[in-house]
Design a protein with these regions (language model features):
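Short coil/turn linking the two alpha-helices of tandem helical-hairpin repeats
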Residues: 48, 53-55, 91-100, 135-144, ...
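Helix-turn-helix repeat elements of alpha-solenoid scaffolds
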Residues: 55-69, 99-111, 144-152, 185-194
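TPR/TPR-like (Sel1-like) alpha-helical repeat modules
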Residues: 152, 225-240
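Terminal, low-structured helical/coil segments at or just beyond the last alpha-helical repeat
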Residues: 236-262
């Protein structure tokens, strides 16, 4: 049985969490023809699934991403290979600081998820396409603001299965509504964001980002007392045993927000 795919919930889309690379990393291999047997593809996908997890080293995650790239290049229409590459790509990109690498990795990840989709109602593929597209948009900046509507559409599709990534579709769409510019420039809607993030924190209380993102929305709504409570919960959940390398950066963000509320 394959392990569940881990995602970080599009944190980098809104620059809430700043990547801290330990040094230059090679860009993902360029797309090209790769000939592998079906068994070899399955072996690579299994290896990538095992390595692209929150609780492994960055070196292992990068190696898993490389495995996923090879599998997808050999079988670009294979659903498992495509979804695995999309998952590995957004995890790898979240710790990259070089814009060109982020763009290459996430563009490839989003396209892999799109090709893997079984149709317009495929929530898992939509979510993985969204988290990669979100990181791509963040790296591109204002020139990519026109793609926010595409992000909203993908996340609405993903929300049919809110349990993905422990409330991932709810918290990512909620944060997008909170952070994006409002109509007519963008899809921003604080009330809608608050509602989605409240649901995420209530239904999936074990994920730190649900509380951290809800606190962000509550601060925007000037409900500082409730925001402090959510930040306390987020910080308590931010342990390396739960979230690996991401725990320290999420806790730092929560600490900084809490300090501003004093």
């Amino acid at each position: 049985m394959r392990q569940s795919r881990s995602t970080t919930g599009l944190a980098s889309v809104f620059a809430l969490l700043v990547g801290c690379a330990s040094g230059p990393r090679p860009a993902p291999p360029a797309s090209g023809p790769v000939t592998l047997t079906a068994d070899e593809v399955r072996t690579l996908v299994a290896s990538a699934d095992a390595r692209c997890q929150l609780l492994v080293s960055r070196q292992e995650r990068d190696a898993g991403h490389a495995d996923a790239v090879r599998a997808h290049q050999a079988a670009p229409r294979d659903r498992s290979a495509g979804l695995t590459l999309a998952s590995c790509a957004q995890l790898r990109a979240d710790f990259e600081t070089d814009e060109a690498r982020v763009l290459a990795i996430t563009e490839q990840g989003a396209e892999a998820a799109r090709l893997a989709s079984s149709g317009p109602a495929d929530a898992e593929a939509a979510y993985l396409q969204a988290v990669n597209l979100g990181q791509y948009v963040q790296a591109k900046g204002l020139v990519a603001i026109g793609r926010l509507s595409e992000l909203v559409s993908l996340l609405k599709t993903a929300s049919a299965k809110p349990e993905i990534d422990q409330g991932g579709p709810l918290r990512v769409l909620g944060l997008l509504y909170v952070r994006a510019p409002a109509w007519p420039v963008g899809p921003g809607d604080l009330d809608a964001g608050l509602d989605l993030l409240k649901q995420a924190a209530a239904k999936y209380p074990e994920h730190a980002l649900n509380h951290l993102f809800y606190a962000q929305a509550l601060i925007e709504a000037d409900d500082h007392a409730a925001a402090r409570r959510e930040l306390d919960q987020a910080r308590a959940l931010c342990t390396a045993e739960r979230f690996g390398d991401w725990a320290a950066r999420w806790k730092k963000e929560a600490d900084e927000l809490a300090a501003k509320l004093r």
